[in-house]
């Protein structure tokens, strides 16, 4: 989603929120939480407070008038009723069942509410230096996490990774084979952004950065000589990330046409651009997701940019057998989250043995 549109939607939600949610928003913006994260949280609060009004828990006329005391006095039974409401209400997102939304969606909603309650009961200070209230009902609410072993996750993920020669094979396919099947009109559209698309996908495959980190890159963040990019990690931390050498020609080809193709001026600092009505703009995450899905589905299997991150991590672990190195490359504080890649690589080793 483009930043301008995102901020417009955030402003619309802020206009209907209670004052204490607006204080929460300002506090988290200072952390800083990303605008995308805060937008998702505001949507969850909109859903929750709409239910508060519909269920009669508050007799306020509108959402912004719901008093803080409603949250303070919310019972465990009330919150469980809200969870049941979510389970039985379909169409909250694409991952619905006949019975209602997925457990993942419910957990996301509860996570947003837990963050708000923690702020109100622990983090904020009133004039006396105390939180607004102390009773945190969210600590009494249990969440059900999806049960899946690392081996099961590895089995599910590995079919959607471009390992071995498939990494550069994917890039070669986009460059040489994909355009051969296009109509003249589609080919013209493809050629307009070919270098950019290849540069983005190559960078994701060669660095393992998150999609948000890639689209937020500025020109100054790329050091082609050293093959290093400076990114803003989760929580606003800056980090320098090494990029594999195979991405260099794709990045060079894009930079060679960037200014002329996208009609840039000095104010256009974003690394990856798109043209809208002749005006260059930073490419948004949604556009990259659609682009990766289109090319990957035609090549092998439809994947998300996050699977390209998994691809890099798996290849790096396979080459180094170092979880520490992989965790540093991905920007993780611990090696626990990299355990998944050991299972994927073990499966690859087993397949190699079976072929002997």
Curated annotation (Swiss-Prot):
Top-level division of the source organism's lineage: Bacteria
Q: Provide the Tyr recombinase domain boundaries.
A: 169-354
Q: Which residues form the active site?
A: 210, 234, 306, 309, 332, 341 (o-(3'-phospho-dna)-tyrosine intermediate)
Q: Which InterPro entries match?
A: CB (IPR044068), DNA_brk_join_enz (IPR011010), Integrase-like_cat_sf (IPR013762), Integrase_catalytic (IPR002104), Integrase_recombinase_N (IPR010998), Integrase_SAM-like_N (IPR004107), Recomb_XerS (IPR023670), Tyrosine_recombinase_XerCD (IPR050090)
Per the record, the coiled-coil ranges are none
Q: Which GO terms describe its biological process?
A: cell division; chromosome segregation; DNA recombination
Principal cellular location given in the protein's record = cytoplasm
Q: Note one Pfam family from the annotation.
A: Phage_integrase
Keyword line: Cell cycle, Cell division, Chromosome partition, Cytoplasm, DNA integration, DNA recombination, DNA-binding
Activity modulation: FtsK is required for recombination.
Q: Where is the Core-binding (CB) domain?
A: 16-121
One of the record's GO cellular component terms:
cytoplasm
**Subcellular compartments:** Cytoplasm
Whether DNA-binding counts among this entry's keywords is: yes
In the record, what terms sit under GO molecular function? Answer: DNA binding; tyrosine-based site-specific recombinase activity
* The family this protein is said to belong to: Belongs to the 'phage' integrase family. XerS subfamily.
Record-linked HAMAP family: Recomb_XerS
Could you tell me what this protein does?
Answer: Site-specific tyrosine recombinase, which acts by catalyzing the cutting and rejoining of the recombining DNA molecules. Essential to convert dimers of the bacterial chromosome into monomers to permit their segregation at cell division.
Report what the protein is called.
Tyrosine recombinase XerS
Q: What species does this protein belong to?
A: Streptococcus pneumoniae (strain Hungary19A-6)
Instruction: Please state the gene responsible for encoding this protein.
Output: xerS
